[in-house]
Design a protein with these regions (language model features):
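Short, solvent-exposed loop/beta-turn-alpha elements that line the ligand-binding surface or hinge
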Residues: 45, 128-140, 189, 215-227, ...
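Extracytoplasmic/periplasmic solute-binding protein
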Residues: 155-174, 178, 198-258, 301
Length: 458
């Protein structure tokens, strides 16, 4: 019986081995019938994507859509949500929506909002690596405007403050300045000095209009030179002040105690404005009595002081052919305009600063600057030699002329106290232009008004 059981176990074991031996016809690898043998890499599928929100002034969204598409070619795992926000509104709204998490990681604003935004604890200082990158590419004036010396402990922008540190706070996107626009059908060679311009103005203003009114061009309000703003706008008048040696807030434009209204240079400029400029631009009229913008668009006057924001209207004006020249000198002294910039910054309390920094750095790239020019027509805030890389800019003579003007411009003051400069400055010019106030008196009043506003009145 034992022998029989042993035989049965041996036979069962042999049968099992035969059953487990693979058939020679069977494949050695099992192929998934669904993917047909394709090896799938799930790395990208399961990579965690991050998200940032950007507030950029782009109402129809086409510009930002194009920028984000290019950004995602470099950073595919950063989702960028764009919300249109006016550049002059972003700072105030971020103060409201930022703390709740409904603000922006990146926001855009003009140059004169920077210091206030820093004081309001809204701006994250950009790292040294970003500053180094931008130093190789960015227009020097624009970079200067975006850089501040700030003592966070004492909330002071005085470079001499004990804990002051100079940092880059924003990425300049575009840069701008006023210039001398002229009708090329009325002027073949633009004036390079105000003396030359005024000599021609005296002849022009005295001419009789050909419309049958029997009035002179001046009586019609068609003065030889106009302004697209008004003659009490200190931003537009800075070139004139500069020719007499006046720049607000000291030589570095950063000393709030040295606004400079009550200086000999300011008084000399006001005297020239009263005696030389006013008679040839408004006659006996007030600072805002002439509609020079409409006159220039209609082809009725040769010159107007304007900025890049005027191009859209002037280019759309039927029959108007114009160009832009450098601001003329006065008494042999060069005139220096203010350079302004639009910039983008990282919100100080963003939950994703690293990706926000990548985005603002990308805004400085050639492709982002090219898209800004294509969609917005603005002069990229790049070094002049890099403008050649931006398609279309080298053929746009109007922008190139502004770039030339910017070579002698001074950066717009960015200290918070600049907010209190414009009001007294405008009143000072109005008093001299409209009200017959002596320049020295108007300057002293402006100085006192400014000092009262910033709490420095004695």
């Amino acid at each position: 019986m034992k022998k029989l059981l042993s035989v049965l176990f041996i036979l069962f074991g042999m049968a099992t081995l035969v059953a487990c031996t693979p058939d020679e016809e069977d494949p050695t690898d099992v192929v998934d019938p669904v993917n047909n043998g394709t090896i799938i890499d799930f790395g990208d599928t399961f990579t965690q994507k991050s998200k940032i929100r950007v507030w950029i002034d782009d109402e129809n969204g086409e510009y930002m859509e194009a920028v984000i598409a290019e950004f995602n070619k470099v950073y595919p795992n950063i989702v960028v949500e764009h919300q249109h926000m006016g550049s002059v509104d972003a700072r105030e709204l971020l103060k409201t929506f930022g703390p709740s998490g409904n603000g922006a990681d990146v926001f855009q604003f003009p140059h004169d909002h920077l210091a206030q935004a820093v004081l309001e604890d809204l701006v994250y200082p950009l790292p040294v690596a970003t500053q180094t990158l931008l130093a190789t590419r960015t227009n020097a004036l624009a970079l200067q405007i975006a850089t501040l010396s700030y003592d966070e402990t004492n909330k002071s922008f005085d470079p001499a403050s004990p804990n002051a540190v100079e940092r880059l706070y924003a990425v300049p996107m575009s840069i701008e300045s006023v210039g001398l626009f002229y009708n090329t059908d009325l002027v073949s060679t633009p004036a390079t000095t105000f003396e030359e311009l005024f000599a021609a103005a005296d002849i022009w203003n005295a001419q009789i209009a050909t419309d049958g009114s029997n009035l002179t061009y001046a009586q019609k309000g068609w003065f030889y030179l106009g302004t697209s703003s008004h003659w009490a706008d200190s931003y537009f008048m800075q070139p004139i002040f500069s020719a007499f040696g006046f720049t607000p807030f000291g030589p570095n434009l950063d000393d709030p105690t040295a606004v400079g209204f009550e200086s000999a240079e300011t008084i000399a400029a006001l005297t020239w404005i009263r005696d030389q400029l006013k008679p040839r631009t408004t006659g006996t009229g007030n600072h805002n009595s002439v509609s020079a913008g409409a006159n220039f668009e209609a082809g009725k006057i040769p010159y107007i002081i304007g900025g890049p924001w005027n191009h859209e209207a002037y280019q759309a004006a039927e029959g108007l052919n114009y160009a832009v020249a450098q601001m003329p000198s006065i008494n042999g002294n060069a005139t220096q305009t203010f350079a302004g910039a639009i910039m983008a910054a990282v919100y100080k309390y963003s939950d994703n600063k690293e990706d926000a920094i990548k985005f603002v750095e990308f805004l400085n790239s050639d492709i982002a600057m090219e898209l800004q020019y294509e969609y917005k027509g603005k002069l990229p805030a790049l070094k002049s030699e890099l403008l050649e890389n931006i398609e279309g800019v080298s053929e746009n003579q109007l922008l190139l002329d502004m770039a030339t003007q910017l070579e002698t411009s001074v950066p717009m003051p960015t200290i918070p106290q600049v907010t209190y400069y414009w009001g007294p400055g405008e009143t000072m010019l109005i008093d001299v232009w409209n009200n017959g106030v002596a320049p020295a008196t108007a300057a002293a009043t402006a100085e006192a008004s400014y000092r009262t506003r910033i709490g420095l009145a004695s």
